[in-house]
């Protein structure tokens, strides 16, 4: 939104609610990058999708447990030519959307970013390299290239790989093992790596076998790559699911743990 602000190349809309919506309307969405803050002003921020009308591309970035309710609420922005790109955690997201909207064009997607909402309308980003992957092997390639160009113009590290299913499994592999162990032991990532690495490895190999049963060939070193990814995280950091358990909030345990079981 910051990159397209004041241009005619694209209109970026935010659909939000409650205190987040109020803050975005007053100050834009703010992203804190260390000592620097980026202010983004969308063309419109609203809790009423009907004010927007049918979109070309709809990025769905909600929690997985809100997916069905949110898709119903978003129907006013979903037209016959709208492409839905879900960036949710989970392996069955496309299927769940098609259960609600049969025949709608849905691409697959995932994003790598370390961030958290510190207050309404303010996001702290602590990752060093963000990446967004999207695609659909059966979708029109020109349309996918169009979106790729839009994202790259916004200076995002965007990729449209042919192996999008593998990319999503790799992302899920990393977050499922970490979310499950940090939540089960009620410990930080650093504590899990130091104290329970054997269980982390066991869960990793179990998930790898599930992937193979689904026809996904993960790299031989996937388990230890996931461990290495956790080791470079700050020792006191944890997962979103663990944080939600600590706060007594609703969690994505069914998506990140239950689905595998």
Please report, for each region that a protein language model flagged, where it lies by residue:
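A structural signal for isolated positions on well-ordered beta-strands in alpha/beta enzyme cores
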Residues: 11-13, 85, 107, 133, ...
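Short alpha-helical
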Residues: 19, 65-66, 91-92, 142, ...
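Rossmann-like NAD(P)(H) cofactor-binding subdomain of soluble oxidoreductases
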Residues: 37-122
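NAD(P)+-binding Rossmann beta1-loop-alpha1 motif at the extreme N-terminus of oxidoreductases
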Residues: 1-37
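Residues at the C-termini of beta-strands that transition into short coil/loop
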Residues: 16, 35, 47-49, 88, ...
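NAD(P)-dependent Rossmann-like dehydrogenase/reductase catalytic/cofactor-binding core
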Residues: 142, 152, 201-261
């Amino acid at each position: 939104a910051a990159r397209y602000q004041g241009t005619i190349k694209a209109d970026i809309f935010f659909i939000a609610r409650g205190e987040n919506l109020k803050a975005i309307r007053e100050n834009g969405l703010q992203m804190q990058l260390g000592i620097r803050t980026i202010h983004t002003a969308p063309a419109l921020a609203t809790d009423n999708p009907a004010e927007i009308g049918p979109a070309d591309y709809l990025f769905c970035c909600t929690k997985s447990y809100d997916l069905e309710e949110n898709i119903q609420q978003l129907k006013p922005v979903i037209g016959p030519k709208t492409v839905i790109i879900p960036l949710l955690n989970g392996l069955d997201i496309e299927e769940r959307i098609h259960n609600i909207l049969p025949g709608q064009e849905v691409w697959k997607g995932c994003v790598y970013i370390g961030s958290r909402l510190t207050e309404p309308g303010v996001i702290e980003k602590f990752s060093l390299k963000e990446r967004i992957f999207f695609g659909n092997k059966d979708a029109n390639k020109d349309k996918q290239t169009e979106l790729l160009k839009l994202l790259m113009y916004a200076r995002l590290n965007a990729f449209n790989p042919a192996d999008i299913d593998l990319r999503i499994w790799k992302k899920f592999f990393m977050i499922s093992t970490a979310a499950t162990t940090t939540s089960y032991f009620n410990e930080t990532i650093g504590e899990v790596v130091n104290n329970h690495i054997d269980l982390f490895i066991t869960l990793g190999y179990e998930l790898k076998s599930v992937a193979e049963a689904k026809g996904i060939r993960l790299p031989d070193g996937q388990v230890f790559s996931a461990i290495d990814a956790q080791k470079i995280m700050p020792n006191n950091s944890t997962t979103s699911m663990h944080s939600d358990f600590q706060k007594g909030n609703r969690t994505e345990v069914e998506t990140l743990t239950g689905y595998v079981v």
